Amino acid sequence: MDRQDYVIEVSHVSKSFKDNKVLKDVSLLCESGKIYGLVGHNGSGKTVLFKSICGFLSCDEGTISVNGKVMGKDKDMLNEAGIIIEEPGFLRTWSGYHNLEFLYTLRNKKNKKHLYSVLEEVGLDPRLKRPVGKYSLGMRQRLAIAQAIMEDPGILILDEPMNGLDKNGVKEIRELLLKMKEENKLIILASHNREDIDVLCDEVYEMEGGVLRRL
């Protein structure tokens, strides 16, 4: 495969916080229509790598390119990405639907009826009036996934997407992610649950001490 066919290219990236080097010469190539899994202990550098790919952190060394454009030179290029890295700051007194509607409107999107199908796709009732502050952890996680997919992104960056979900919820979200893969989406996910990784992922990488290696 030619390098221009890769959607995300991480090339020799290093990142330090003071004297702590958390990413060490990391390289990764990702293409559409695949799910990439990232495993590793807490503090191994997974979240820092995700934040760097999403443009939330700059690299000390190396480059990250998305669709051929180098991160840092084009701030808008990840608008097509759906991201779960930390729990979104939903307005706790609003319903799930109204939270999504507010974000959708901010992004100048018009077809709000589309949000009903998005919520149903992640297993939430769009007519539910309950404020997000009274949602269970699993319901909040479903809402976070709905936010990530509501604009039909070509790229999904998901840190522990199954967190807080019960057995049925895990099954539903796995099926959703596999469906999105079939739609030629690129998905990168981190999980401590090896079963999620084994069921979903085409390629698996381990982060240990800031070093990335393929398993």
Regions found by a protein language model. Give the residues of each.
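H-loop/switch region of ABC-family ATPase nucleotide-binding domains
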Residues: 191-192
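Conserved ABC ATPase "signature" region
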Residues: 101, 112-127
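Helix-to-loop junction immediately C-terminal to a conserved catalytic motif
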Residues: 54
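The feature captures the beta-strand-to-loop junction immediately N-terminal to the Walker
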Residues: 39-41
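Catalytic Walker B motif of ABC-type/P-loop ATPase nucleotide-binding domains
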Residues: 156-160
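Conserved ABC transporter NBD signature motif
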Residues: 62-77
